[in-house]
């Protein structure tokens, strides 16, 4: 599993074999899929390589596919044949997005209709607006990123939108830091876990869940 996203009705599970499986959130029954049934890779409209990130935003499913960001209409994703679910368009990032074959070091977060992605290689956060991505007269719509927040001294890893702020972990650090989603500026320290390297994070029912990249374990900590 590369990543998961949850909407009001569906659970999206992105796999490494060029496929996104969709389940009903209430019943957990399989609904549909995006991608080839044979799991083969390719460059055409129905093929993907690896799912590095998934987030739902305004009836759109945004998929981080290695160094590409694609958008899908959720209603098409749950009704069209798996190998014929078309994407709405792509996001063009000026400097490109760095990647490798470790999806665990790539983060995505949605805040107020904008999508944020950690770019470990370029030491930055990429920012774009999914609602700009529309199908116009049957043609794809490619959009550009709204902003790129640069961080010369750190390499971003995990990312989470919570309480009107962005929470971000950095490489070789047990720190989770708070950032302003409008400017990308550092606001302060949320928490620090010595001797750990924090990857993806989630907060639920007052608990912080995170991946300790050093140990390869899912950890939890009680919030304040």
Question: Over which residues does each language-model region extend?
Answer:
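Short coil/turn linkers that define WD40 beta-propeller blade boundaries
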Residues: 28, 69, 80-82, 123, ...
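Blade-level signature of beta-propeller repeat domains, shared across WD40, Kelch, NHL, RCC1
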Residues: 196-224
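Short loop/turn segments that connect beta-strands within beta-propeller blades
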Residues: 24-28, 76-80, 129-133, 180-184, ...
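Beta-rich, blade/repeat-based domains predominating
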Residues: 1-7, 39-57, 94-111, 148-163, ...
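Beta-propeller fold detector
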Residues: 30-38, 82-94, 135-149, 187-192
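Conserved core beta-strand positions within WD40 beta-propeller blades
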Residues: 10, 60, 114, 165, ...
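Conserved beta-strand positions in repeat-built beta-propeller and related beta-rich domains
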Residues: 13-18, 63-67, 117-123, 168-172, ...
């Amino acid at each position: 599993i590369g990543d998961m996203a949850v909407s009001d009705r569906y659970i999206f599970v992105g796999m490494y074999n060029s496929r996104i499986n969709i389940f009903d959130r209430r019943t957990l029954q399989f609904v549909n899929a995006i991608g080839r049934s044979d799991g083969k890779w390719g460059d055409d409209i129905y093929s993907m390589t690896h799912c590095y990130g998934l987030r739902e935003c305004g009836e759109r499913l945004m998929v981080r596919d290695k160094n590409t960001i694609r958008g899908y209409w959720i209603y098409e994703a749950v009704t069209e044949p798996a190998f014929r679910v078309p994407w709405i368009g792509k996001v063009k990032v000026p400097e490109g997005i760095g990647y490798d074959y470790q999806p665990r070091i790539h983060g995505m977060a949605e805040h107020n209709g904008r999508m944020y992605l950690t770019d470990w290689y370029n030491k930055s956060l990429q920012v774009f607006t999914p609602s700009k991505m529309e199908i116009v007269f049957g043609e794809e719509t490619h959009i550009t990123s709204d902003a790129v927040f640069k961080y010369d001294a750190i390499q971003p890893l995990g990312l989470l939108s919570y309480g009107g702020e962005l929470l971000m972990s950095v490489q070789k650090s047990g720190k989770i830091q708070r950032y302003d989603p409008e400017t990308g500026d550092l606001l302060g320290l949320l928490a620090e876990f010595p001797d750990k390297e924090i990857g993806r994070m989630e907060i639920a029912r007052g608990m912080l869940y995170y991946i300790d990249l050093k140990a390869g374990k899912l950890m939890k900590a009680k919030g304040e």
